[in-house]
Amino acid sequence: MPRKAKVAKDLMYYPKWKSRKKNRCPICGRPRAFIRYFNMCRICFREHALRGDLPGVRKASW
């Protein structure tokens, strides 16, 4: 729980320059591998997609 509280606190902080702002996953707080279109990291995206929580997203097969 402390990690989520820290992420929430960091999101309230406005950096001195806009370029310093880092996109973070609102679910787990991960700063890397962020997918802007879905506003979550790749790991959370995969979990939600496999569960069927994201409409129109399906596993690719060819």
Curated annotation (Swiss-Prot):
Zn(2+) binds at residues 25, 28, 41, 44. Binds 1 zinc ion per subunit. GO terms for cellular component: cytoplasm; ribonucleoprotein complex; ribosome. Part of the 30S ribosomal subunit. Contacts proteins S3 and S10. This is Small ribosomal subunit protein uS14. PROSITE patterns: RIBOSOMAL_S14. One of its GO terms (biological process) is translation. The keyword Glycoprotein does not apply. Belongs to the universal ribosomal protein uS14 family. Zinc-binding uS14 subfamily. Keywords: Metal-binding, Ribonucleoprotein, Ribosomal protein, RNA-binding, rRNA-binding, Zinc. The gene is rpsZ. Its cofactor is Zn(2+). Binds 16S rRNA, required for the assembly of 30S particles and may also be responsible for determining the conformation of the 16S rRNA at the A site. One of its GO terms (molecular function) is rRNA binding. Pfam families: Ribosomal_S14.
